[in-house]
Amino acid sequence: KELQENYNICVSDDFFGVLETDTGFVYSDLSVKSAINAACKLGAHTLCDEIVRICKENGVYKIQTQNSSIQAKQILISAGSYVNEVLGVCEFDLPKVPVGIRRKVVNWFDTDSYKLSQGFPAFILEFEDDYFYGFPDFADGLKVGRDKVGEIISTREERVEFGSYEQDTLDIGKHIKEFFPDLKDFSKGSVCTYPLSPDDDFIIDFLDENLFFMGGLSHGFKFAPALGLLGVKALQTQKLDPSIKQYFSLKRFG
């Protein structure tokens, strides 16, 4: 009843809601940009889309880019959906990192309600064996995604543009108005990808004596400051914190 009265969300009587008043949402692009800017202020250099190959000679990694050659004693790799492309440039033996890729879509809907300015929050809503998630309208409409649907792909080329499949609008649009009755027409959609480890959790481990990997889970940008600190400490000490190793080691997959 309170969900309907306060937020105009229609659910059955067996639903209950939890409101977390001290939470919010993160702009992914801005958070990544902020992290890069902070790193540059500390002396980091950025090269985008330039690594051609990485080899290892006498314990030193030699990184060949399109325009230069870099030598390093240690490497930290943080990669998402296309991790195997990144690891594929390494010309030495590494354990396989089992990360798949799911093509995902999100939809926007026009509305005069569900606005950030009206106090409407970001949300997660259970639905069958899945859940909808989304964000209030603060510019382009109510943004809605659905967690477990989407096509399993293996290459960038298979991440086709929005609208290539009928399900790009049906997976969300077929049911979402049952819960949000004030939604108007579908406005637009976009495509992204989820990296998928076998147990839907991070993989954090040494792949080589001085090559440390973090990845395997979507939305890693939210945890980037903590993951970065963890990775640097692991390389400095040459060991992984036992609590991290227990839950996130690559060895858990056998």
Regions found by a protein language model. Give the residues of each.
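Active-site substrate-recognition segment that forms the wall
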Residues: S81-E209
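Short, hydrophobic/aromatic-rich segments at coil-to-beta transitions
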Residues: G59-I63, G119-A122
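A short alpha-helix-loop-beta-strand transition element characteristic
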Residues: K1-Q4, S12, L94-V99, D185, ...
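Short loop/edge segments at beta-strand edges and connector loops
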Residues: L47-E50, T65, K188-S190
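Flavin (FAD/FMN) cofactor-binding and adjacent substrate-gating region
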Residues: K1-G43, L47-D49, R53-G59
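Active-site acidic short loop of glycosyltransferases
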Residues: T65, A72-K73, E209
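C-terminal catalytic lobe of FAD-dependent flavoproteins
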Residues: E178-G254
